[in-house]
Amino acid sequence: MIPKFRYWSHALQRMAEVIAINFTKNELTIMPETIGYIVPINEEYLMQSTGLFDKNGTEIFEGDIIKMRFPMDRRFIGRFKVIKDPVSPKIGLLDESLTTEVYDLYNYMPDYYEVVGNVFDEVVE
């Protein structure tokens, strides 16, 4: 898998594709529209693709909010946040007051989850 990143531009209030990373200068080139911008790397706003896609074919990135139906209990639907992990993408309940457990996203079939937003969206359906 070729690493793919996106970046939340706080100044532009939008998500942008990362087209280059310069580790020597600690900066990114982002492309929110048709004009490229160079910004300093801020890991809080940098999100890597998991390489997975939801039931609608939407690519899943760290920081995405997914709505998931559990295969064992068709009645339970939860909202989860995709969490950074050096080994494989994990998901944790969006409401951490319920539990702080995390689960391996690869364990679930794409038919069970759908991207509904990301951690920077103000409103998640």
Where are these regions (language model features)?
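Secondary-structure transition motif
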Residues: 1-125
